[in-house]
Amino acid sequence: MFHHSSKLQYPVRVDKPDPEFAMLLQQAIGGVEGEIRVAMQYFFQAMGARGDARIKDLLISTATEELAHIEMLGYAVALNLEGAPLSYQEASAQDPVVNAILGGMNPRHILSSGLSAMPVNANGVPFDMSHIYASGNVAADMLANVTAEATGRVLATRLYNFTEDKGMKDFLSFLIARDTMHQQQWLAVIEEMGGIGASLPIPNSFPPEGEANEHSYYCLNTSLDKPLPEGRWSQGPSYDGRGQFTAKQEPELLGSEPLLGNARPGSGAQQEQISGVPPEQPV
C-alpha cells in the first residue's frame, strides 16, 4: 500500500508564469525520459523481483519517490499556466501574433485539462508505457535504470538551461540532484551483486557450453573504407574475465545466401513464384 502526505517533497515556485515552459515540462512528466516512465519501471521491476529482498524494497521506495516528482512537476506545470490566454480575444489583446500560436503553449492545456498538467510529453503525445523495462533479471534491470536516470538528468539539465525563472531553476536543481543519486544507487546495487565483472555476461546463469565462445570477444568492423577504431573494446581482458578482446577487420562470412525457394500454393503469390519458372516471353 502507499501513504501520502499533503506536503510536496521539495518547494515548487514559479516567479513568472510561462505557458511555453509548461509545455516543455510535460516532457519530464510523460516523455520517455520522464518520471512516469521511471516510476512505473521501478514498480514493475519490484513486482517481479526475486532473490535479495533489499533490492525489491529499494525499487518500491524509489518508485514512490518518482510519484512524488510527478506531483511536483504537475504543480509546476499548473503554476506556469497561470494567466495563460483562454480565448481568441484574450490572446489577440496581448499580441496579434500570439493569436496563432498561443504564446507557444500546448492548446490542450486549455482544451483538455483546464490549465493543468497531463500524462503527455512536450508534443502532447500520451505516455503509453512502451518504454517500461522490467525483465526479471536484476542486473539487466539495474543497467536499464542507470540509463533511464542518465537520460532523465540530461533532460532536467536542458530544462534548467532553458528557463530564466529562479523558482524553476531551484526546483530543477533538486530533480537533477536526485537523478545524480539514483544513477549511482543502481550502480551500487550491481556492486552489491559482485560488480559489473561478476554480473557479465547477462544473464550470467547461462551455461558457457551453450554459447559459441569463439565469437564472444571480438569487435567486428563492418566499414568498407575505414579500419576498426582501436580502444579498450578491441584489446585487453574482457570484463567478465572469460576472454580477451580482439579486433576483426572484416566479417567472416560463414553462412550461405539466404534463398527461400518457391512460394506455397494458396499463399497469394504470383504463379511464377509458386512454380519457380519464369513466364514465356512473347515473340
Feature map (PLM): residue ranges:
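Non-heme di-metal
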Residues: M1-V283
